[in-house]
């Protein structure tokens, strides 16, 4: 029942009693997204989720958040729902790519009942939200969705074109490949 959150759960004692940054997408940003989130974590002392606005029709692929602005690109999260129907959308802000959780998340996970046989990380984070202990950062950066094949290919191409040791050979390869299309 804990497959979705198993990697997070296994990290609870390594090292003990520290905040936990977690990410599952590649994000290209001058100001690293994890740093954007940890700065807010240190300022407010709450869990923090990295969010961006997505097109309304894409929200059901992710989650929806009920938020109020705090400052610049920082919001207070009041509620969230994973994979909502179009009629359940609270906003077009969705959690994308990064979160920083306080150590208490492990106790919350332990006490979160499974839904459809699975303990969801979103449900555990929503407990923090309902306690007023979750912030959202509308992060600055270009996100590559590692949840789909095209996102993986785009990230590899973009990063390959910037890699100091590979960029010239990779660019030549891409030009040759494109000429054959």
What are these regions (language model features)?
Residues 1-64, 109-110:
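Conserved beta-loop-beta/alpha segment of the NTase-like Rossmann-fold superfamily
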Residues 39-40, 127, 176:
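Alpha-helical scaffold elements within enzyme catalytic domains, especially in hydrolases
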Residues 69-172:
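Catalytic-core segments of class I nucleotidyltransferases/pyrophosphorylases
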Residues 170-173, 177-181:
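Intrinsic disorder at enzyme termini
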